[in-house]
A protein has these predicted regions:
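N-terminal, positively charged/glycine-rich alpha-helical extensions of SAM-dependent methyltransferases
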Residues: 1-29
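Conserved class I S-adenosyl-L-methionine
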Residues: 153-179
Length: 179
């Protein structure tokens, strides 16, 4: 394992902030009342029409553990699998699923390695800003193409990592507007 991969895994297993805090029951109930609302980057919601273009509802949340996006997909009727290398992030999804009576499959995996899924498994792959944490994106895109059904949707968020330093420098903290 590359040192930066281990560093990232350790960070996500130990950090506590808005990105690692699972949604509460009340937050999910509010989200349940409205059309699907998730973000690939901080503060920028994905248009609900994007999800309507999918041929099915089998979704892979790639590197988006934490008990946030996965539960939103589940309450909207998606067949949800979350793959993340952080065991603690996956445990948050499992905790919310159990608390809310949702079905969310969790898989501990590294997106820099082969994905543990059959070819053409998913209708949608949802990958929020996580690609900034890996050096080589080639495997991630090759594997996403392999496990995505023909005509499937690949949604990937990009953000310049400088934003995280800027937020820290200026003392601001993004709120839950990212999901």
């Amino acid at each position: 394992m590359n040192n930066y991969i281990k560093l990232n895994e350790d960070r996500w297993n130990n950090v506590k902030n808005d990105y690692t805090e699972p949604f509460t029951h009340e937050e999910l109930e509010e989200l349940r009342k409205n059309p699907i609302s998730v973000a690939l980057t901080v503060g920028k919601k994905v248009p609900k029409e994007w999800f309507e273009k999918a041929n099915g509802k089998k979704i892979l949340g790639l590197a988006c553990g934490g008990g946030q996006q996965g539960p939103v997909f589940a309450i909207k009727g998606y067949d949800v699998t979350i793959m993340d290398f952080s065991k603690s992030q996956l445990q948050r999804d499992e905790m919310v699923a159990k608390r809310e009576g949702l079905k969310i499959n969790t898989v501990q995996g590294d997106m820099t390695k082969p994905f543990p899924f059959e070819n053409e498994t998913f209708d949608i792959i949802f990958n929020p800003v996580s690609n900034v944490y890996i050096e080589d994106l080639e495997n991630m895109y090759k594997e996403a193409a392999r496990v995505l059904k023909k005509g499937g949707l690949l949604m990937v968020g990009f953000m310049n990592p400088w934003i995280y330093m800027t937020l820290t420098l200026y003392g601001t903290n993004p709120t839950r507007n990212y999901c």
